[in-house]
Amino acid sequence: MDSCEVTKTRIPFKERPDWADVKPVPQDDGPCPVVPIAYTEDFSETMDYFRAIYVADERSTRALQLTGEAIQLNPGNYTVWQFRRVVLEALGVDLREELKFVDRIAGENTKNYQIWHHRRWLAEKLGADAVTNELEFTKKIFSQDAKNYHAWSHRQWVLQALGGWEDELAYCQQLLEDDIYNNSAWNQRYFVVTRSPLLGGLVAMRELEVNYTVQAIRASPENESPWRYLRGLYKNDTQSLVQDSQVASVLWDVLTSQNSHVHALRFLLDLLCHDLEPSQELKSAVDVLTPQSCSPDLALTKKICSILEHADPMRVKYWNWRKSMVRVQLLQSQNAERLANLSVQE
Amino acid sequence: MESRKVTKTLEDQWVVERRVREIYDYFYSISPNSPSDLIEIERDKHFGYLSQGLRKLGPSFSVLDASRPWLCYWTLHSIALLGESIGGKLENDAIDFLTRCQDKDGGYGGGPGQMPHLATTYAAVNSLITLGKPEALSSINREKLYTFLLRMKDASGGFRMHDGGEVDVRACYTAISVANILNIVDDELIHGVGNYILSCQTYEGGIAGEPGSEAHGGYTFCGLAAMILINEVNRLDLPGLIDWVVFRQGVEGGFQGRTNKLVDGCYSFWQGAVVFLIQRLNLIVHEQLGLSNDLSTESADDSSESELSDEEEHLEGISSHVQDTFPLGQAGACQENASHSPKIADTGYEFINRPIAMRPLFDSMYLQQYVLLCSQIEVGGFRDKPGKGRDYYHTCYCLSGLSIAQYSWTDEADSPPLPRDVFGPYSKCLLEQVHPLFNVVLDRYYEAREYSQACETVSPLSLAPTFSET
Ligand SMILES: [Zn+2]
């Protein structure tokens, strides 16, 4: 590993002949700083020299090398990164070399904003040439941490700015096969289905996606991710959602199974609030789950909230609130009806 | 029935659940009737850990060398939440240090001589507000800060973290937060911000860091708070957001940051504060649910009538509070219309003075239990979850979240919570109250507002406000 040369036998800047002309600039911490950090000798010295070239705005090869050393000591220093970009541009350095540098730093710092931002800057400069490499790189990150937020943002940016959509849906599929609970993969799936220029958009993809999602729900009804995804497939089109027979059928299947009913009930409640006319089967499935203390004449929506108050005690206050909202919605429609009747009579 | 495949998500989740259950079982075994009596905030230990951090940090903190205003904020805000004080000398040292982080062209960097950055600007400004002295507030160059904020504006409507930096919802929040609290907001600054944040609300209901990304607790707080501050919160899908956030509280009692991720103490604030903010948005929520707010008196009258009176039976035994859950038509709830727009510059003040017409939609006691039993470390400090180490970030946000949970049942700002709403012995556990939009202690917010109001608004900005001379 040639990248270790710096850390292995570091020669202090003050002993390096090519730095003899530079006067280090100490940090202006004041006489009694708060949150003072007990820097190592190497750290202090490197930063003192960095300040010197930063203040002098020296865009040179040695400045580039110095920023590299400073970044290895603290990859979170955005000032160093920003100055490095300035120097890179001034020197016209081959940015593929720069990518190798970032790869070396990235290893232990997959949650660092600066590195990802620098990668994005690089990929933007490299253009279409960077696509394969960036998609592979993020894949490698996901093999260790499939939910890495920065890596997903980066991947989405690459797809949108530079392309590479061809295999993305298959990749989501594969990640979900590995772990159907991986919500980041579901989110990416939504991203691809709604934004890929190759797939025709959400409406065109909907039927296929509903099939897939309904299967995932049947396999693990307690998994929140596919339920939210299913709702997302009908974003801004609840009319179609309410009419989808596949949805009604998966709801019935789950409600009559031994599995957790929480998400199915939540989903059904949502549908009812969007004027779903429930089938007799669904009504009876809910009745079976309704606590005996409930009056049988209670509205279906309120029954569902009552079941959820028991089945999901963590959110009892939420379900209670939902029930109270249903109550008012009901009252308002009654009032509206009454007013309508009045005006008819008049 | 297909058998459920055990995946990494499930395995990780089970490990955490087991650890947490062991802790709860232990506490309930030593005191089955009132385990919370045994719990308290280790105030002295936390104070020791925090003031130690202010005075000296080891070499391992070098990786936070570009986040020193954050270290100030995490420690100073935590100390303020505990109701402790660090003394005049250390306070002056903090003001002096932060002044050295202030850029000559406005904003604060991660340390002396570093470029100004929005996140560290937020941390520095909140630190100075927490210090609260006139010298602290007057050390902020408001005029230059305004030009820095304007310089960070991006064509997308969002903000950039620093010159050449990344654009995301965090940047929007930190910019809007400092602008609001320092009374330097104007139309130019907020133009397009609402569109940007709106484009980050996902199909799940929460808010992501960038358009297309996954809904996330930290960004959801930032997005919601910023939308409230620019008075455009009615543009978000609030019922969807509520439904997402209440499902982030897990069986452990604490919150997770994203769907199917692990519980983490810091989300006690990020997610807890989202629910807390929503409690003051009931009028807009009703509007979005298609409920007209002026119907409230009618519904209050009608609610005594037959069809609704079966309500009470299943409320009993669930919670002593639930009858209060829906106080539509209570005094104050309808005094102002949801579309009424306060002066943008004072949305933070108007917001905190709204009556809280909605009860918390999360389990605030259970959240407190998680923070105190699972995140708190006996020797001082707080952590993400059992098995992890303490740090200043988690200490700050666990304490902030604890405060949010403790005050979530209060009716209005400035009123103390009832003992039954505070987990553990009241006097030992009760923290100071925060302003949920800025996450600074409420009293310090009022002082800062008084100061900022005394300064002139954007153009021309006064550099010598009268307040500092008293
Ligand atoms: Zn955390």
From Swiss-Prot, chain A:
A Pfam family recorded for this sequence: PPTA
UniProt repeat feature PFTA, residue ranges: 59-93, 94-128, 130-164, 165-198, 205-239
Reaction equation(s) it catalyzes: L-cysteinyl-[protein] + (2E,6E)-farnesyl diphosphate = S-(2E,6E)-farnesyl-L-cysteinyl-[protein] + diphosphate; geranylgeranyl diphosphate + L-cysteinyl-[protein] = S-geranylgeranyl-L-cysteinyl-[protein] + diphosphate
Keywords: Magnesium, Prenyltransferase, Repeat, Transferase
Disulfide bonds: none
GO molecular function: CAAX-protein geranylgeranyltransferase activity; protein farnesyltransferase activity; protein geranylgeranyltransferase activity
CC cofactor: Mg(2+)
GO cellular component, one term: cytoplasm
EC code: 2.5.1.58, 2.5.1.59
BP term (GO), one: protein farnesylation
Signal peptide (residue range): none
Keyword Repeat included in the entry's annotation: yes
Catalytic class of the enzyme: transferase
Record has Transferase as a keyword: yes
Assembly notes: Heterodimer of an alpha and a beta subunit.
Record family assignment: Belongs to the protein prenyltransferase subunit alpha family.
Its job: Essential subunit of both the farnesyltransferase and the geranylgeranyltransferase complex. Contributes to the transfer of a farnesyl or geranylgeranyl moiety from farnesyl or geranylgeranyl diphosphate to a cysteine at the fourth position from the C-terminus of several proteins having the C-terminal sequence Cys-aliphatic-aliphatic-X.
Protein name: Protein farnesyltransferase/geranylgeranyltransferase type-1 subunit alpha
Species name: Solanum lycopersicum
Gene: FTA
